[in-house]
Amino acid sequence: MRAPEFQSNTTTSTGCDVCLDPQKSFANLFKRTVILLSGPTGSGKTDVSLRLASMVDGEIISVDSMQVYRGMDIGTAKVSLEDRQRIPHYLIDICHVQELFNAVDFYYQAMHACQNILSRNKVPILVGGSGFYFHTFLSGPPGGPPADREFRDQLALYIQDHGLSFLYENLCQKDPEYARTITKNDKNKIVRALEIIHLTGRKVSEHSWSMEPQESREYNCRGWFLSPPKELLLDNIQLRCQKMLEDNLIGEVRGLLEQGIRENSSASKAIGYREWIEFIDQGSPEEAYEAVKQKFITNTCQYTKKQRTWFKRYPVFRELPTLGLTAETLAGKIAEDYFLHG
C-alpha cells in the first residue's frame, strides 16, 4: 500500500559557501537547489516563507508532522486558505486524523513534490519545524517501505475485533527484539513494525538507519534557521497560544475527538491538542482552565528549546537572527543567497 498521493493545496551545500571537497563541488553543479527554512515555533516561518516564495517564484512544501491532518488547523497555525490559493502548498490537509503518516511517507511525498515543482522551473521551499522530517529529507527515509493502506486497514480490523494487545503479541513473536523497545500501547509503532515485516520480510531490528546529520544526495540545499531572541520568542508564544484559544482551539479539539483523533496516538499527543483533550476528558472544569492554558504555553516553550538543540546539529542550516528585522527583510536575505548560490 502506498502513502497518500501528494497534493498541492491551491483553493547540498552544507551551508558553507566554499566546499573543500572537489568531488562534492563538481557533483553539486548538477544538483537542483532547494531552500530549507526552519525555526522554533513562533519565530515567524510562515510570514517569511510566503514573502520568500513570491521573491524567488517558489512553491512551499510543509515540513510539519501535524499539518498533514485535515481539521488540525488552529493548533498547528496552518497557513490560511487564501495564502494557499495564492502560493501553492504541499503536504497540508492530505490525511484524515485517524490515518497514520510517518517519516517514510513524508520522504516520498516531499521528493515527489520537489520533482513536480522543479519540472515547472519553480523553486521548492521546505518550511516547518519538524526536525526529524528535515533529517529524513536530507538523509533518506528510515529503513522500510512507504505505508501500505490495504494492510493497515486489515490491522485496523484486527484491532477492532481483538484489541491492540493482539497485534503487540503478534509483533513479540515476529520481532521480540524490537517489541521490547516500545510499549504495548504504542499503536503507531506496532502497526508500522508489522507493516515493515509484511512488506520486506525482514525484522525491524534488522534495519539500520543513521541519525547523524548528512547532506542531501538529491539536491543542493540552502538552509536557514530563524533565531529570535529568547525573551521575544517567549512573548510571541504566549500571544500565539492566547490567540489560538480566542480562535476556538477547544472547539476544534472537540470536533477532532468526534472524528476519532484518539485513534492516532501521534496526533492526539501533539502540543496544543493533548492538553485540551485532557481538559475535555475532565469535564472542562472552569477552575482548571488557567492551569491547562499555562501548561499549553509551557509545553510549547519547552518544545522550542528542543528545536534549537536539534537544528544546531545540522550545518546545512545557518542561523538567521531576526531581531529588528521584518519578514520582508528576512525573506530578502534568503532570496539574495539563493540568487548568488542557487
From Swiss-Prot:
Chain positions recorded as ATP binding sites: 39-46
Full protein name: tRNA dimethylallyltransferase
An MF annotation (GO) of this entry: tRNA dimethylallyltransferase activity
Assigned protein family: Belongs to the IPP transferase family.
One Gene Ontology biological process: tRNA modification
Magnesium is among the record's keywords: yes
Quaternary structure (record): Monomer.
Broad enzyme group: transferase
InterPro entries reported for this sequence: Dimethylallyltransferase (IPR039657), IPT (IPR018022), P-loop_NTPase (IPR027417)
Lineage: Bacteria, Pseudomonadati, Chlamydiota, Chlamydiia, Chlamydiales
Chain residues that bind substrate: 41-46
PANTHER family reported for this sequence: TRNA DIMETHYLALLYLTRANSFERASE
Chain spans, region Interaction with substrate tRNA: 64-67
Keyword terms of this UniProt record: ATP-binding, Magnesium, Nucleotide-binding, Transferase, tRNA processing
Gene3D superfamilies for this protein: 1.10.20.140, P-loop containing nucleotide triphosphate hydrolases
